[in-house]
Amino acid sequence: MTRAAWSQNLLLALEQFGEEGQIYASYLRARKTYIGFWKVRKNVSAFWTPLGTIYLNAVEYSLESNPADPRLLTLLIHEVKHLQQGLVTAHSVYGELEAWQLQFRLYHQKTNARMHSSIRKLLALPFGWDRDVLKQAGVFMQEYAGKGYRVDLLPLYPLGKEIRYRLFGKMPT
């Protein structure tokens, strides 16, 4: 099977993944998003690029991977969320928290699989601008993904909002 055929099967499976799947598949189709494979470090299952492409970690995924796998589909939804957020928001703990909560809520709704304790704590956090919550979120993400997942290098807020907070003490609204 070619990568293009596999990607089409992935989008078909995403469309069958409920209302959210249909929305995200439509987004990917409308933008003709390239979905490929790239070997990266073990703490990264997938990533997006500023060019609007999505890559799955070739260490974990290949053309042999089941496109209907709920873990794969929710991971794809996570990356699409980052494309929707844009470069600045996606590169913040705030953006990561939104994508992680979306991914794992959907995964556990669809599979009812037992949750890792760090994911359970992450899902219990209120999504918003509270800096203490965002710091906790980063800790839970690293507990789950490992220290090689460098969320600790990201600003808590999208960069412009982070700078405003640090200069003027103004929390985003």
Residue locations for each model-derived region?
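Auxiliary, metal-adjacent structural segments of Zn-dependent hydrolase domains
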Residues: M1-Y55, Y61
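Extracytoplasmic/secreted cell-surface and envelope-processing proteins
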Residues: E64-S65, Q84-Q85, Y94
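Pan-zinc metallopeptidase signature
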Residues: L134-T173
